Amino acid sequence: MVNMKASMFLTFAGLVLLFVVCYASESEEKEFPKEMLSSIFAVDNDFKQEERDCAGYMRECKEKLCCNGYVCSSRWKWCVLPAPWRR
């Protein structure tokens, strides 16, 4: 008797494989891996970081001061959220 989890996993893996094969056959003229990776990791200009006078969360705070609501960690020199033991 086949375990239900194993059969669901195989079904899901089969569907994923079918999707990849269908997509590859439709886009033969494209460079498949490069196109797929570029669409997954596409960076929009709206999401790029702006240059600030202060450092945000998990940013280095050696030269810059941390933005409002963050404190500079004395151990790691990153801007972190304030906690009772960091005051």
UniProtKB/Swiss-Prot annotation:
It comes from the Eukaryota. The keyword Lyase does not apply. Keywords: Disulfide bond, Ion channel impairing toxin, Knottin, Secreted, Signal, Toxin. SUPFAM superfamilies: omega toxin-like (SSF57059). Disulfide bonds join 54-67, 61-72, 66-79. Expressed by the venom gland. InterPro entries: Huwentoxin-1, Huwentoxin_CS1. GO terms for cellular component: extracellular region. PROSITE patterns: HWTX_1. One of its GO terms (molecular function) is toxin activity. The keyword Acetylation does not apply. Residues 25-52 form a propeptide. Pfam families: Toxin_12 (PF07740). Residues 1-24 form the signal peptide. It is found in: Secreted. Belongs to the neurotoxin 10 (Hwtx-1) family. 51 (Hntx-8) subfamily. Hntx-8 sub-subfamily. Ion channel inhibitor. The presence of a 'disulfide through disulfide knot' structurally defines this protein as a knottin. This is U3-theraphotoxin-Hhn1m. It comes from Cyriopagopus hainanus.
